[in-house]
């Protein structure tokens, strides 16, 4: 079994989402010692945002030589995702949504003919067999009963993205209110780490 581990926080060892995503991977490794893990840190090895020349090349136009490294990185990222049985993502909320580094990664895996296709009844996801677990951290509280709920574009966006490619039941472990104060951060992190250790292994 193969697991792809993605981190996107810019905070390094101070990141809550990184701590929780690591705990998720540790839990799955304990349950399946033979688990093969591929790790990609989107801040240490950032992907370029899509360009017009990249999109043109993807649609069959001649690719200039200088685009070669970008196309190679795109192919590597897509192949990592396609090969994975399980995908674990550390995703903090930045300005109400995902980090731009994670958006650049998503732009490389949402590829027509690979992870989705257009059919007579509209788009159809092709990646439904994968398990996706996301460790999210948010500075405030964005529950459905909160006045800030309309500003939540992290979990809602990721649910839509993964649903679009056929993964209709992504799992989320959340650490909320981490910027409200030290006590809130400690409690949120402890709860998320406990949820990670209690995660169903298969």
UniProtKB/Swiss-Prot annotation:
Q: Supply the SUPFAM superfamilies for this chain.
A: Flavoproteins
* UniProt catalytic activity: 2 a quinone + NADH + H(+) = 2 a 1,4-benzosemiquinone + NAD(+); N,N-dimethyl-1,4-phenylenediamine + anthranilate + 2 NAD(+) = 2-(4-dimethylaminophenyl)diazenylbenzoate + 2 NADH + 2 H(+)
Which Enzyme Commission number(s) are on file for it? Answer: 1.6.5.-, 1.7.1.17
- The superkingdom of the source organism is Bacteria
Assigned keywords, A-Z: Flavoprotein, FMN, NAD, Oxidoreductase
Q: How does it assemble?
A: Homodimer.
Q: What does this protein do?
A: Quinone reductase that provides resistance to thiol-specific stress caused by electrophilic quinones. Also exhibits azoreductase activity. Catalyzes the reductive cleavage of the azo bond in aromatic azo compounds to the corresponding amines.
This chain belongs to the protein called FMN-dependent NADH:quinone oxidoreductase 2
Q: Which organism is it from?
A: Bradyrhizobium diazoefficiens (strain JCM 10833 / BCRC 13528 / IAM 13628 / NBRC 14792 / USDA 110)
């Amino acid at each position: 079994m193969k697991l792809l581990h993605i981190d996107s926080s810019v905070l390094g060892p101070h990141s809550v989402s990184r701590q929780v995503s690591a705990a998720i991977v540790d839990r799955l490794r304990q349950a399946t010692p033979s688990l093969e893990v591929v790790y990609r840190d989107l801040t240490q090895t950032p992907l370029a945002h899509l360009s017009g020349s990249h999109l043109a090349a993807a649609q069959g136009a001649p690719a200039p030589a200088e685009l070669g490294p970008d196309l190679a990185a795109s192919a590597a990222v897509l192949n990592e995702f396609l090969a994975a049985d399980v995908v674990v993502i550390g995703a903090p909320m930045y300005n109400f949504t995902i980090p731009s580094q994670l958006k650049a990664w998503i732009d490389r895996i949402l590829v027509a003919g690979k992870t989705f296709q257009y059919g007579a009844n509209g788009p159809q996801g092709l990646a439904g067999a994968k398990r996706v677990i996301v460790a999210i951290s948010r500075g405030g509280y964005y529950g459905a009963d909160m006045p800030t709920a309309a500003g939540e574009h992290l979990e809602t966006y990721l649910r839509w993205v993964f649903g679009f490619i056929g993964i209709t039941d992504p799992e989320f472990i959340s650490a909320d209110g981490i910027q409200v104060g030290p006590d809130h951060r400690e409690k949120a992190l402890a709860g998320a780490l406990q949820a990670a250790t209690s995660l169903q292994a298969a």
